[in-house]
């Protein structure tokens, strides 16, 4: 991995906060498969090769299929994502792109058909966390390395 500065050494308190949030999201009410799909999709949208590489690798290790990983950028045209996953991915895209001042009521209600209040909050935190990691990684010049 190549990076511009050693941000874990320069800002240990800030990175501890990021890691604490990561720990929270891993223990959240959202299942691991959905969390990884969100992380991959948001990283694709943000163009973070380092995070795409990391999270596709993590997804494969947990048994995710190549088909679902490869087609994630076109999830809304596929029948092999669950309605819950599709709702989470739609919310992920909306929050990542921020096309308006708020999440539309229609989208909120579609997501809430599959997730309770706690899960909705957890989804938003997971989406925001991976967006933060993407921006840190891109700004610091992290690159996906060959294996």
UniProtKB/Swiss-Prot annotation:
Q: Name one Pfam family in it.
A: CMD
Q: What's the domain of life for this entry?
A: Bacteria
Q: Which Gene3D superfamilies match?
A: AhpD-like
Q: Which InterPro entries match?
A: AhpD-like, AhpD_core, CMD-like
A Gene Ontology molecular function term for this protein is:
peroxiredoxin activity
The name on file for this protein is: Uncharacterized protein YdfG
